């Protein structure tokens, strides 16, 4: 997809996944993905979805993945980017956008503050840290996506140093401190290294590349 990519680096390990979420304002008449899709079908141009990334960025891609899985043409979905979370929230509350595409950890913070309702997340099942958030899958929308985090090193890293880094990361999962941070953010552990990490990245590259081509960005 890009001239430089993960193959130019030493792959250390994938660490966590942060699922994506679709949220609406706390007073919105939309209470589910079915409501959002119905509103979109009734008024496509008046039912915009916002996000904190540029067109073609992660929030846009998640909105496209979800709406495509709901049976809509992702290229037709009106996406409005915002530079800051405050701007996006103002747009959501004013009705400029009908929904906001964001990370699940950010959505949890907004929901806990009483500012939004989470109407769908891209996890395969509900996440214990915020079990009230329904998945897309349980609402009949076959959309699953995880925004992963991982570690990379410079090319040519000696094998013994690579193994030491991987061992340190693996041991991190066993600590209480890590579990506290993970649970607070709604993250899921997705530790993988070696060929498993490579296969994961290649699948992500294929899925995202295909969608970006469909949206006309590649």
Regions found by a protein language model. Name each.
Residues 77-82, 152, 195-200:
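Short linear loop/turn motifs
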